[in-house]
């Protein structure tokens, strides 16, 4: 299924070898990010990993969680996991990226962080944005990851995206991001939408108004 892209005028050049890395770095540095104040939530961090696709443009890594996982199995997700005692969010995401998809990433490849997102299932997730050149060791850990996808960044600028859906269970609207022939929901969709608006476009945006689908609340 072909993607329908919106008018890309005003969108930063997504050539991987261009100025995009500096644009993202500058925009994240200027963003006044917020952390959750709810100490009862489990802390986690995930990686929004910017990589080069087969056309020389920038993409990001999306995974499909393993079928055998106890929580949120077979859902689309960003690589990451729960922050262990004594770890920083950055240390967690570097460890989880290596464990889940085989890439060894260093702290100097981190461009910055976005807002923490509180989930209905009791987590507070920090998205960490990274720039990775070497994908030679990219490989799914069979117990945790079913599939790995490299998604063109331009997918975030589709004319049919984002979609907002009203539900009876909440006053907030559920976010859907059409990516390829799939619909990605919050929390992953919330993190990617803020990445688009803040890191790529330099706009102001929070994520606390974004609802998850009811099936993700558990």
Regions found by a protein language model. Name each.
Residues 140-179, 214:
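NUDIX/MutT-family hydrolases
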Residues 1-77, 81-99, 103-136, 175-218:
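N-terminal leader/linker segments that precede catalytic domains of diphosphate-processing enzymes
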